UniProtKB/Swiss-Prot annotation:
Homotrimer. This is Bifunctional protein GlmU. Its main location: cytoplasm. It comes from Streptococcus pyogenes serotype M18 (strain MGAS8232). Catalyzes the last two sequential reactions in the de novo biosynthetic pathway for UDP-N-acetylglucosamine (UDP-GlcNAc). The C-terminal domain catalyzes the transfer of acetyl group from acetyl coenzyme A to glucosamine-1-phosphate (GlcN-1-P) to produce N-acetylglucosamine-1-phosphate (GlcNAc-1-P), which is converted into UDP-GlcNAc by the transfer of uridine 5-monophosphate (from uridine 5-triphosphate), a reaction catalyzed by the N-terminal domain. CDD domains: GT2_GlmU_N_bac, LbH_GlmU_C. One of its GO terms (biological process) is cell wall organization. Its cofactor is Mg(2+). Acetyl-CoA binds at A379, N385, Y386, S404, A422, R439. UDP-N-acetyl-alpha-D-glucosamine binds at residues 8-11, 22, 72, 77-78, 139, 154, 169, 227, 332, 350, 365, 376. Pathway: Nucleotide-sugar biosynthesis; UDP-N-acetyl-alpha-D-glucosamine biosynthesis; N-acetyl-alpha-D-glucosamine 1-phosphate from alpha-D-glucosamine 6-phosphate (route II): step 2/2; Nucleotide-sugar biosynthesis; UDP-N-acetyl-alpha-D-glucosamine biosynthesis; UDP-N-acetyl-alpha-D-glucosamine from N-acetyl-alpha-D-glucosamine 1-phosphate: step 1/1; Bacterial outer membrane biogenesis; LPS lipid A biosynthesis. In the N-terminal section; belongs to the N-acetylglucosamine-1-phosphate uridyltransferase family.
Length: 460
């Protein structure tokens, strides 16, 4: 059995009120088009054809070489859009799935079941339908007394009886590929919209006594077509519930799943504890036994097992096992933390590698640095890495002790086991096993405070 797919992605999406093409709006971190394309892969199509139109280059860039593309210059209806794909699929034997690119909730399992139903019933066309609580706006499925599908009626063309029908057309179909394009040559624009309706091919098949069937979705949510921001928010809510439920089934604990945002490509190992208001985005991986506390935000990062992240932001970073971060820390892109590193409150790290068991507990900036293992970085330490034009590197050796309020002016190297005195400004190499003091000598002038205007003795 050979399958093909046509994805309709040419529309502008006027009701979205956006410069972005409708199918490129995101749901849980992926564009709607990407969600649809991933689900389509479940039927293993020999060839996928995406129909593009409005801002076509932007849409094409999302799928790149994963799909063939055809251009619909004028948007003259769904039937017209499918006609554009004939140049890619003409004369091929097999079954063609037609699906809209704005249906992000459709699952691969449902599409696979649709194809199987179509093949097993030897249909020339199969419509994916659903039972809608409120069918207004949808095309209605009209059946005869034997339950056979005889036609699909659009909302604007439906009579009073047809408008009461609850079974709706989801806009997804499977056709015999050759018969699809033969039938499309017979449809017209004689309807309320003045467009070529893809649904008109059903009546053509019925007139020829060819078999048309309908496969009913189990979950109405999968039928959602996103036409405005309200529907986009609905899709986001449903997708978020799916994602959190999937992780819970796989052994992840959520204290308040309704407040958590996790994108589609995030991976979470078992026995992770996630508190409320946590955000996980991009290609993030969370290792087993890790705890993410309230307010943590992580994007495109790897967190090792048994780590504890407390109310902190982590971007494009790699953390080994047993790391503790926060509260209120910020790990910026390019950060690597080895095992059992501790990054404490109000510490910022950027584009730096920090060795095992090193600690930076408070109020510190580490940028463009290579820090060894078992280093203590005192509170208030700053790596001065930028001169206004270029960034420079700081290298700190193993077991070094950086005193509080040290200012390390890069490029700089501090050797193994070296110590910088608190309050020092260091601008030259510190050899291994050295102590460096880079501050002015304290001068004490006894009794001088009595000369100051605010001294208590002056108010008498």
């Amino acid at each position: 059995m050979t399958n093909y797919a046509i994805i309709l992605a040419a529309g502008k999406g006027t009701r979205m009120t956006s410069d972005l093409p409708k199918v490129l709006h995101k749901v849980s971190g992926l564009t709607m088009l990407e969600h649809v394309f991933r689900s389509v892969k479940a039927i293993s199509p020999e060839k996928s054809v995406t129909v593009i139109g409005h801002k076509s280059e932007m849409v094409r860039a999302v799928l790149a070489d994963q799909s063939a593309f055809v251009h619909q210059t004028e948007q003259l209806g769904t039937g017209h859009a499918v006609m554009m794909a004939e140049t890619q699929l003409e004369g091929l034997e097999g079954h063609t799935l037609v699906i809209a690119g704005d249906t992000p909730l459709i699952t691969g399992e449902s599409l696979k079941s649709l194809i199987d139903f179509h093949v097993n019933h030897k249909n020339v066309a199969t419509i994916l339908t659903a039972t809608a609580p409120d069918p207004f706006g949808y095309g209605r499925i009209v059946r005869n007394k034997d339950g056979e599908v005889i036609k699909i009626v659009e909302q604007k063309d439906a009579n009073e009886y047809e408008q009461q029908l609850k079974e709706i057309n989801t806009g997804t179909y499977v056709f015999d590929n050759k018969r699809l394009f033969e039938a499309l040559k017979c449809i017209t624009t004689n309807n309320a919209q003045g467009e070529y309706y893809l649904t008109d091919v059903v009546a053509i098949f019925r007139a020829n006594k060819e078999k048309v069937g309908a496969y009913i979705l189990r979950d109405f949510n999968e039928s959602l077509g996103v036409n405005d921001r309200v529907a986009l928010a609905t899709a986001e809510t449903v997708m978020r519930q799916r994602i959190t439920q999937k992780h819970m089934v796989n052994g992840v604990t959520f204290q308040n799943p309704e407040t958590v945002y996790i994108e589609s490509d995030v991976e979470i190992a078992p026995d992770v504890l996630i508190e409320g208001n946590v955000t996980l985005k991009g290609r993030t991986h969370i290792g087993s036994g890790t705890v993410l506390t309230n307010g943590t935000y992580i994007v495109d990062s790897e967190i090792g097992q048994g780590s504890i992240i407390t109310n902190s932001m982590i971007e494009s970073s790699v953390l080994a096992a047993g790391v503790t971060v926060g509260p209120y820390a910020h790990l910026r892109p390019g950060t690597t933390l080895d095992r059992e590193v501790h990054i404490g409150n109000f510490v910022e790290v950027k584009d730096s590698h920090i060795g095992e068991k090193t600690k930076a507990g408070h109020l510190t900036y580490i940028g463009n640095a290579q820090v060894g293992s078992s280093v203590n970085v005192g509170a208030g330490t700053i790596t001065v890495n930028y001169d206004g034009q270029n960034k420079y590197e700081t290298v700190i050796g193993d077991h070094a002790f950086i005193g509080s309020n040290s200012t390390l002016i890069a490029p700089l190297e501090v050797g193994d086991n070296a110590l910088t005195a608190a309050g020092s400004t260091i601008s030259k190499t510190v050899p291994a096993d050295s102590i460096v003091i880079g501050r002015s000598r304290q001068v004490t002038k006894e009794g001088y405070a009595k000369r100051l205007a605010h001294h208590p003795s002056r108010s008498k």
